[in-house]
Structures are given as C-alpha cells and as structure tokens.
C-alpha cells in the first residue's frame, strides 16, 4: 500500500495518489492563459475524448459537488413546456426528483425500488402513456446500493421516442467504458473526485453541443446556468464565470495524466472490477452477504448486510477498521440494515487483501 493516514474505501472522495495531491502545491491566476488555455481547455478536450470519438460534443466545468451539476442540467436544459421522466432506484435518483420539484419542473417519477433494476418495458409504457415527456434522466451507477443501471436499454427508448437523455454518471465515468454518442446521451454528468481520481471541488457536464446551444435563457438559476457557463468558457478560452477552484483543477489535470498512464478507462475498469470481485469473494468467506445479486453489481461500490448479531454496531465496527487504516461507508438503503465498501481510487489487490484481514480482525461480535 502507498503511504497515507488511511485508505478511503468510499465512492468519492477517494484515496488519491501522492502526485495528484502534490499538483495542488502550485497557485494559478484565473485570468492567465497558462491556466485557462493550458489547463482548463485541455481538460475540456480530454473529457470529450474520454466520452466519445464522435464530433459535436463539448465539456462544461462547474464549481461544486456533483449534485450542483445535476441541478444545473435539470434547471438549464428543460424548458417551461418540458417534462422529465426521472428513473429512480436509490438516493441519487430521488435527489433528482426533489430537485425537479423544487424548481417547478414538470416531472414524472418512476421509482422502481432500491434493490430493483429499472424495467425497460415499464419505462416504455410510461413514454407511450405520457407524450408530454421531453427528457429522460437516470443514474448510471447508483451508489446507494452499488447497482449498475441499464442505461443502454433506456438509450434505445430515448432514441425511439425522440427524448433528450440525461445520465448521472457520477461514479461511473472514467471507470466504466462508454460512448455517449453511441448511447445517444445528450448530457452526461460526473465529478472530479470519482473515477478520474481527482479531488473534490468541481463537477462537469459533457453535452451534445447542438442541444446545449438551444438552452439560452432557460436556466432557473444564475450561478447554475449551464448554458452561460459554457458560453463563458467558449468565448473566453477556458475562463470560468465565477472563481475557478484552481488547485482542484490542477489536481484533476494530473489525475487525467495518470488515467492515461494506467492504460485508459478500460484498464481502470479492469482494476476496479478485479477489486470488487476479490472483495465480494473475501467478504463471503468471512460470512457477509451482499445486498444485491452479483449480476446487478457495479465495479464501484458494494453494499453488504449488517451482521445478524445483537452486539453489532456499525460505528464500533467502523472505528475498529479505521484504527487499522481503513475507512468504509455506512448504509443508505432505507429498508435494509447494511454498510458499503467502495473499491475505486488508488486501491489495488494488496489493499483488498489487507482490508479483508483487517475486517476479520475487527469482527468483535465473533470474539
């Protein structure tokens, strides 16, 4: 394992490399061409290249967490006469529904339950019965449970029924291969501190340029106006409308270099998948049960049922692991008592082996 205070086994913020951290030791002027042209514009181009080889897409960077970018997309691209079908099977789909409702956006929620995979036939039925729907929005990797949702099936429906397609790929972009042009995705949303393995501070949207260009004047917010942010970056060669998180941006530029050095998204996906499979096998050997069937798992994070022991307390288990150098995540599923373990970031085979040994040592209810 690399030198650190503890290993973050979370879906982001996550454990970053020493060199990503060191990239933040430099200061940048937000008006300077070395920063805007040399760093910001390069990042925008690289993000589009990671998303698709096709022309006609652009990247917009936005200060804040991933949820800021999700709200910016919903509030900026759906017009007053628009209506969005939001597919929800976890906290992050539910958050999109809440955002739409607070902004007064017409919304058709489809909640299929936290441990159920969205059903394409049910989505098609909704589209047939509600022709007012103009947009479809869904989460790709739902970290509430660790489920990987079927964005390919929904992409086919979006194309067939001529709907604009919004995908929250917060914890999948950069860690799971995808081509947004092939999937007919109009807006893909992700964040600096997920699979690219940067640090928190900004999110980004990769958008079909023709669609984004039609969104002038639609935004329900000043600071979360995606169109205005895009035009500022386009017209001023990488300049942000408001203060740029310069140190986070420098860290992200380094993280993109390290993604390329690893072999790109496919190689990183293979590492994440190997981590997750090794984790699940080891946890089963220790007596833990995954919340989901193996066929539903993403390679990002896995939820496990809490031990059926009267003396078990998550906080005690958590602290015993932290004392050994590992940090895990509490559960977020409303109907099941569980906890979650992520395996993205600077996490390798040796780390999973060490984690499993630490978990075995932390099972105080067995002692």
UniProtKB/Swiss-Prot annotation:
Keywords: Aminotransferase, Pyridoxal phosphate, Pyruvate, Transferase
Residues modified as N6-(pyridoxal phosphate)lysine: 194
Catalytic activity: (2-aminoethyl)phosphonate + pyruvate = phosphonoacetaldehyde + L-alanine
Gene Ontology biological process terms, A to Z: organic phosphonate catabolic process
Entry cofactors: pyridoxal 5'-phosphate
An MF annotation (GO) of this entry: 2-aminoethylphosphonate-pyruvate transaminase activity
Entry-linked Pfam families: Aminotran_5 (PF00266)
Membrane-spanning intervals of the chain: none
InterPro entries documented for this protein: Aminotrans_V_dom (IPR000192), NH2EtPonate_pyrv_transaminase (IPR012703), PyrdxlP-dep_Trfase (IPR015424), PyrdxlP-dep_Trfase_major (IPR015421), PyrdxlP-dep_Trfase_small (IPR015422), SP_NH2Trfase/AEP_transaminase (IPR024169)
Enzyme class: transferase
E.C. designation(s): 2.6.1.37
Domain of life from the UniProt record: Bacteria
Oligomer status and interactors: Homodimer.
Family: Belongs to the class-V pyridoxal-phosphate-dependent aminotransferase family. PhnW subfamily.
NCBIfam families: PhnW-AepZ, PRK13479.1, transamin_PhnW
Function according to Swiss-Prot or TrEMBL: Involved in phosphonate degradation.
Name of the protein in its database record: 2-aminoethylphosphonate--pyruvate transaminase
Organism of provenance: Klebsiella pneumoniae subsp. pneumoniae (strain ATCC 700721 / MGH 78578)
């Amino acid at each position: 394992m690399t030198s650190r205070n503890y290993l973050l086994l979370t879906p982001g913020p996550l454990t970053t490399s020493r060199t990503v951290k060191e990239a933040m030791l430099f200061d940048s002027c937000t008006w300077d061409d070395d920063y805007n042209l040399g760093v910001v514009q390069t990042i925008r181009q690289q993000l589009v290249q990671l998303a698709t080889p096709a022309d006609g897409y652009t990247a917009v960077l936005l200060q804040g967490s991933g949820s800021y970018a999700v709200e910016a997309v919903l509030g900026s691209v759906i017009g007053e006469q628009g209506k969005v079908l939001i597919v929800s099977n976890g906290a992050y789909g539910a958050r999109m529904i809440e955002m739409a409702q607070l902004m007064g956006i017409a919304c058709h929620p489809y909640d299929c339950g936290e441990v159920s995979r969205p059903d394409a036939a049910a989505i098609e039925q909704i589209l047939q019965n509600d022709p007012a729907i103009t947009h479809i929005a869904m989460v790709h990797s739902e970290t509430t449970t660790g489920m990987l949702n079927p964005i390919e099936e929904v992409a086919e429906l979006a194309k067939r029924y001529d709907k604009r397609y919004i995908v929250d790929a917060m914890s999948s972009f950069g860690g799971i291969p995808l081509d947004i042009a092939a999937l007919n995705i109009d807006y893909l949303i992700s964040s600096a501190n997920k699979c690219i393995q940067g640090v928190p501070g900004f999110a980004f949207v990769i958008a079909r340029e023709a669609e984004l260009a039609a969104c002038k004047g639609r935004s329900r917010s000043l600071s979360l106006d995606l169109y205005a942010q895009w035009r500022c970056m386009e017209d001023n060669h990488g300049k942000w409308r408001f203060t740029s998180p310069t140190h986070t941006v420098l860290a992200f530029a380094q993280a993109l270099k390290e993604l390329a050095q690893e072999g790109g998204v496919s190689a990183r996906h293979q590492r994440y998948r190997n981590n997750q499979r090794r984790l699940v096998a080891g946890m089963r050997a220790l007596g833990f049960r995954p919340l989901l069937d193996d066929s539903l798992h993403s390679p990002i994070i896995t939820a496990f049922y809490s031990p059926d022991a009267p003396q078990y307390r998550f906080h005690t288990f958590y602290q015993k692991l932290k004392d050994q150098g590992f940090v895990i995540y509490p559960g977020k599923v409303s109907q099941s008592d569980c906890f979650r373990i992520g395996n993205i970031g600077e996490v390798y085979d040796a780390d999973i082996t060490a984690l499993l040994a630490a978990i075995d040592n932390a099972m105080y209810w067995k002692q």
